[in-house]
Amino acid sequence: MLAGLVPAPDHGMREEILGDRSRLIRQRGEHALIGISAGNSYFSQKNTVMLLQWAGQRFERTDVVYVDTHIDEMLIADGRSAQEAERSVKRTLKDLRRRLRRSLESVGDHAERFRVRSLSELQETPEYRAVRERTDRAFEEDAEFATACEDMVRAVVMNRPGDGVGISAEHLRAGLNYVLAEAPLFADSPGVFSVPSSVLCYHIDTPITAFLSRRETGFRAAEGQAYVVVRPQELADAA
């Protein structure tokens, strides 16, 4: 634990650290990446507040990234018109930004440790682009990594908001665009955020985190990359 951070209550959250390397990196407390999925009902005001309070007392810096890319493509695949999809995405993102602002207010003096950006903003940075080149190449050249990404696509599509009207080729294309946009954050968040080490924090173990947290050959996570599943105690107990 770094200077300035003190042992803190768990804020009702339970951690599951994925792998021995992640455990060592997690102990440093240098940087956390919190990914927020727009439209995901898990990220209620209550859960988001608990998550940010938990991170604010455990990490020197925390980047919060909310995904605002390729959401409209999924809605269009569901049968919405382009105009309907655009309006729906705008409403969803407006509500999400409001919840994030309120959640940051709850962390008090720790708010200065946080930076909030959309994925589309992050995509404009040279650091993200450099890592994206590597993950795109790995998707084409490393069959096992590609399989993990495809498993993630199916998970995204099957758990999308809405009525679940079935899975089409359009859904899978939209899901792949969504997952490949996120892949740099899974594989090398230290590189994307220019930090020595980073802990990716999410409420479930995804196909990509499960794969990269164990991979020792071929395309691997960056040396300073760690993974933690963190969620409210009552949800962890029910899992």
Swiss-Prot record:
Q: Where is this site: Could have a critical role in the catalytic mechanism?
A: 40, 182
Which Pfam families does the protein's record reference?
CDPS
Q: Which residues does the record give as substrate binding sites?
A: 40, 178-182, 202
Phenotype when changing residue 178 to F? Poorly active
Describe what happens upon changing residue 178 to A: Almost inactive
Q: Where is this site: Essential for the cyclodipeptide synthase specificity?
A: 200
Xref: InterPro entries: CDPS, CDPS_sf
Question: What's a single GO BP term from this record?
Answer: antibacterial peptide biosynthetic process
From the UniProt record, list the reaction(s) this protein catalyses: L-phenylalanyl-tRNA(Phe) + L-leucyl-tRNA(Leu) = cyclo(L-phenylalanyl-L-leucyl) + tRNA(Phe) + tRNA(Leu) + H(+)
- Could you give the subunit structure recorded for this chain? Monomer.
Q: What does this protein do?
A: Involved in the biosynthesis of albonoursin (cyclo[(alpha,beta-dehydro-Phe)-(alpha,beta-dehydro-Leu)]), an antibacterial peptide. It uses activated amino acids in the form of aminoacyl-tRNAs (aa-tRNAs) as substrates to catalyze the ATP-independent formation of cyclodipeptides which are intermediates in diketopiperazine (DKP) biosynthetic pathways. Catalyzes the formation of cyclo(L-Phe-L-Leu) (cFL) as major products from L-L-phenylalanyl-tRNA(Phe) and L-leucyl-tRNA(Leu).
Q: What is this protein called?
A: Cyclo(L-leucyl-L-phenylalanyl) synthase
Which source organism?
Answer: Streptomyces noursei (Streptomyces albulus)
Taxon lineage = Bacteria, Bacillati, Actinomycetota, Actinomycetes, Kitasatosporales
